[in-house]
Amino acid sequence: MEDTVKITAEELKGYIERIEKLEQEKRDVQDHIRDVYAKAADEGWDIKVMKQIIRLRKMDDDDREEQEILLDTYKRALGMSYEEELSE
């Protein structure tokens, strides 16, 4: 029984250490991403728009199209459509 507990404890420790290592790698990647955004901002790029584009690129084409149609519909309902501004 003691051997089983020892093996189980070692296995658990292995999982914990792997997760801790991955968490550190995740923090490192997040730091790199922040650095890229900072460099882009320094060069005049709009970070909010870049993040929005990245979010859209992650979406399925059909989902993205549906969201864009809904957004356009809502904007037109509120008088915020670019097309309406051009016609004025």
Curated annotation (Swiss-Prot):
GO molecular function, one term: DNA binding
Transmembrane regions listed in the UniProt entry: none
One Pfam family here: GapR_DNA-bd
NCBIfam families referenced in this protein's UniProt entry, alphabetically: PRK13694.1
Family in the record: Belongs to the UPF0335 family.
Protein name: UPF0335 protein WD_0557
Species this protein is from: Wolbachia pipientis wMel
